[in-house]
Amino acid sequence: MYSGGLDSLGMIYKLLTDPEYKDYKLHIHHIHNRNVEHRDRAEAIVVPMVLKELEQLGFSFVYSESEIGSQPYNGQFMYDTDSINFFAGYICSVNPRIVKVAMGMQANDANHSLEERRIRANKIFTAFTDVEKIFPVLEMTKREIYDSLPESLRNMFWSCRVPVYTKESIQPCGKCKTCLQLKDAGIR
């Protein structure tokens, strides 16, 4: 499952280059998740750029995408962990050739609220399928993921949770959790 962020980009690159995964065919799926964060517009720019670059690097894969839109209720909104697991489970339930689903979770993705969301998301996923989830970059930091990418891919990701849009550009907010993690890692 490909969000457009650094972790999932690193996951895809590892799946395409690590000999451990050489016997698998890669199906990349991206979800245009329209919610209060408004990341979908920024991701819609970077995702096709990455796919084109991966093809230019000689990699082959299948690509598909889904769309979901949700408004906030009682100050809460649907997290990407829920929609990713919904679509991953659904796709596995209708495509028996899929034997593993890769998620871009990495070493610094840990806190109590994230764990509660992961438990809920896993229930959503397993309602559809018993396909195994794998986490190829789980033991890597953001810096290690970034450094593992070829130069041509290193800045083709969108990780900011709340982009700042103007008529001329889209900029990272510089304040959300992922922006701060990238800054701390010396990436942006």
What spans do the regions from the language model cover?
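Nucleotide-activated chemistry modules centered on ATP-dependent adenylation/adenylyltransferase
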Residues: 1-188
